[in-house]
């Protein structure tokens, strides 16, 4: 790209900034996006720099600009409309340019995000009601399934017998924050935002201890109701295997209503719900596969698809159905039932096993699964609508945490995770707008991700919280005392053990690169050049070892070959390890005593003044052990 084009791109950004400052009007993300260079894909850093440039200049950046009116949500339900005349400026080339085709993920994300309308308070309530209705339908449907009833009973027993942790059964966060109201305080400093969850967040173990008795009591009641329902269902089916008999049972319906109310009060862990759904969906897939196989078999005998569906769907597949189809007027059905009698008997037996496992007739089970799937789709679609409409909120919060160790897109993704949690736990009846509620979750997700991922060497989040507390106290004491407080003073202020304070302050140090330049000159070298290598051999030691090796070889050469070999093996000279008398004896095929005698004789020869004076000079400088030849003089 030529220099003139680059200057032109910079002029567009500066022009937009100058106009916004002079007219004291805010800009939108679309304005910045259009002002970015079109002839090349801007990097994430360029987008961050552009956003920060406007923020530093005091220009507000809003999420959207629709029909020349920008709606700002202030507090709960107040809305102020600010009229902007940006589109009325004919000389503004920024507004006239089109984004065009691009494969840059940042631009595509902003473009798609801008295509979703913002939600009013009424829209948020309507979507929240859709989510609530879908959940209620799913809960009621699950409670009608004997599979779920058996799971509730097993979960209660595992919880009482300590085979299951409470956190594995329920959603602790939903219970932890049930009585909390997160405030959307925009005046919090960035430092406080990064640390606020430290004082407000209870540990999982503490929360479990607090709510465990209440959950056990509820699960005990649920387990008892489930046992009553299963017994009542068994009695009804023993009298008559007809669904209407059970549906008309007053006792069964009363207990079922109680079960639905109790289960609705507990926020079960998503994994526990998926466990029940997984079992039901698995059985449903088996049924579908059996029906498809039966349909293909029927088509081979000339039964049309529509005729098969008319006779199969809604019918109870048993021996009576088989007899009925034998009397069918259509020849194809008679031929199918007659020739495939064994296959149909086997299928009836398999369906009977499924009915026994599910506690429901096949048709009732399929209807129940269809209802659950429909409510699940309804809930997911409503959540999707709420999430997509609030993606702008994530960006507005994420930009405050730029240059904290994570890239801008990573901050957005972490914020989106917090947004999804906020949608799951949003309670519209409290009267707050969703943005007020979601801000806390988005901020928590981003700060937790920065604490968990921003450092080169990962530090656990709970340790990050302790580091922040100590650093904050250190700054406060610096302002009070006028000098840097010592570790002892910080420990006394926080009532924390001195060793822990020192350990945390040591961990808090940021790692630096060994390639960092030292000094102002280019020839000053790198930091790694000044760090001692503990494993490297000093030149003087290397020279001594080389000389010792040569002298030892000459001294041992004065012995007989057998004596030299025995000493080398016994002391590991020139070998990887030393050898025992037994091992040396096996090599020479003699006894241990004979090897000891040879060794003693050889050592006496080495202690002769003529030979020993050549090794005496190494006795003070050499290291003992590990095959050091100077050890021969001590033996």
From Swiss-Prot:
A motif (Interaction with polymerase core subunit RpoC) lies at residues 410-413. Residues 465-542 are annotated as: Sigma-70 factor domain-3. CDD domains: Sigma70_r4 (cd06171). Signal peptide: none annotated. InterPro entries: RNA_pol_sigma-70_dom, RNA_pol_sigma70, RNA_pol_sigma70_r1_2, RNA_pol_sigma70_r2, RNA_pol_sigma70_r3, RNA_pol_sigma70_r4, RNA_pol_sigma_70_non-ess, RNA_pol_sigma_70_r1_1. Keywords: Cytoplasm, DNA-binding, Sigma factor, Transcription, Transcription regulation. Transmembrane segments: none annotated. Residues 177-191 have a biased composition (Basic and acidic residues). PROSITE patterns: SIGMA70_1, SIGMA70_2. Residues 581-600 bind DNA. It is found in: Cytoplasm. Residues 555-608 are annotated as: Sigma-70 factor domain-4. The keyword Transmembrane helix does not apply. GO terms for biological process: DNA-templated transcription initiation. One of its GO terms (cellular component) is cytoplasm. GO terms for molecular function: DNA binding; sigma factor activity. Its main location: cytoplasm. Residues 386-456 are annotated as: Sigma-70 factor domain-2. Residues 177-204, 609-635 are annotated as: Disordered. It comes from the Bacteria. Belongs to the sigma-70 factor family. RpoD/SigA subfamily. NCBIfam families: PRK05658.1, RpoD_Cterm, sigma70-ECF. HAMAP family: Sigma70_RpoD_SigA. This is RNA polymerase sigma factor RpoD. It comes from Rickettsia felis (strain ATCC VR-1525 / URRWXCal2).
């Amino acid at each position: 790209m030529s220099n003139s084009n680059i200057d032109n791109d910079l002029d567009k950004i500066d022009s937009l900034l100058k106009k916004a400052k002079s007219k004291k009007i805010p800009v939108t993300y679309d304005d910045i996006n259009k002002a970015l260079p079109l002839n090349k894909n801007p990097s994430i850093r360029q987008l961050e720099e552009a956003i920060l440039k406007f923020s530093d200049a005091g220009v507000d950046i809003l999420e959207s600009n629709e029909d020349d009116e920008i709606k700002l949500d202030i507090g709960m339900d107040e809305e102020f409309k600010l009229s902007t005349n940006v589109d009325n400026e004919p000389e503004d080339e920024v507004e006239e340019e089109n984004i065009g085709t691009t494969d840059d993920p940042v631009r595509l994300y902003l473009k798609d995000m801008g295509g979703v309308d913002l939600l009013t308070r009424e829209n948020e309530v309507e979507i929240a009601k859709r989510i609530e209705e879908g959940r209620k339908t799913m809960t009621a449907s699950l409670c009608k399934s004997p599979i779920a009833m058996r799971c509730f009973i097993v979960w209660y027993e595992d919880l009482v017998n300590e085979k299951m942790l409470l956190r594995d059964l329920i959603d602790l966060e939903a219970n932890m924050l049930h009585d909390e109201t997160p405030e959307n305080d925009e005046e919090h400093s960035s430092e406080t935002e990064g640390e606020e969850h430290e004082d407000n967040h209870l540990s999982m173990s503490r929360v479990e201890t607090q709510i465990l008795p209440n959950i056990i009591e509820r699960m005990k009641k649920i387990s008892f109701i489930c046992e009553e329902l299963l017994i009542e269902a068994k009695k009804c089916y023993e009298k008559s295997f007809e669904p209407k008999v059970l549906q008309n049972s007053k006792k069964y319906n009363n207990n079922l209503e109680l079960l639905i109310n109790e289960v609705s009060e507990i926020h079960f862990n998503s994994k526990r719900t998926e466990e029940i759904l997984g079992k039901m969906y698995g059985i449903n897939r088996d049924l579908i596969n059996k029906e498809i196989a039966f349909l293909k078999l029927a088509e081979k005998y000339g039964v049309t698809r529509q005729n098969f569906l008319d006779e199969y769907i809604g019918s109870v597949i048993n021996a009576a159905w088989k007899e009925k189809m034998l009397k069918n007027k259509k020849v194809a059905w008679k031929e199918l039932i007659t020739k495939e009698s064994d296959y149909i008997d086997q299928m009836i037996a398999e369906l009977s096993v499924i009915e026994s496992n599910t506690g429901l007739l096949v048709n009732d089970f399929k209807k129940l699964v269809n209802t659950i799937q429909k409510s699940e789709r309804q809930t997911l679609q409503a959540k999707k609508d709420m999430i997509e409409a609030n993606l702008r909120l994530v960006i507005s919060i994420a930009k405050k945490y730029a240059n904290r160790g994570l890239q801008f897109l990573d901050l957005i993704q972490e914020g989106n995770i917090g947004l999804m949690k906020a949608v799951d736990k949003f309670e519209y009846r409290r009267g707050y707008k969703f943005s007020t509620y979601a801000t806390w979750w988005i901020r928590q997700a981003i700060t937790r991700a920065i604490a968990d991922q921003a450092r080169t060497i990962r530090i656990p989040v709970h340790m990050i919280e302790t580091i922040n507390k100590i650093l904050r106290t250190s700054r406060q004491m610096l302002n009070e005392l006028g000098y840097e407080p010592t570790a002892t003073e910080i420990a006394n202020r926080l009532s924390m053990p001195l060793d822990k304070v020192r350990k945390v302050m040591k961990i808090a140090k940021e790692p630096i690169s060994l390639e960092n330049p030292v000094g102002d000159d280019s020839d000053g070298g790198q930091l790694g050049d000044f760090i001692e290598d503990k494993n490297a051999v000093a030149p003087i030691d290397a020279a001594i070892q080389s000389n010792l090796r040569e002298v030892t070889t000459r001294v041992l050469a004065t012995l007989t070959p057998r004596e030299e070999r025995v000493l080398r093996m016994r002391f590991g000279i020139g070998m990887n390890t030393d050898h025992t008398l037994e091992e040396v004896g096996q090599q020479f095929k003699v006894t241990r005593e004979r090897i000891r005698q040879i060794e003693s004789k050889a050592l006496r020869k080495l202690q002769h003044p003529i030979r020993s004076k050549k090794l005496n000079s190494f006795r003070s400088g050499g290291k003992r052990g590990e095959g050091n030849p100077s050890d021969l003089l001590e033996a």
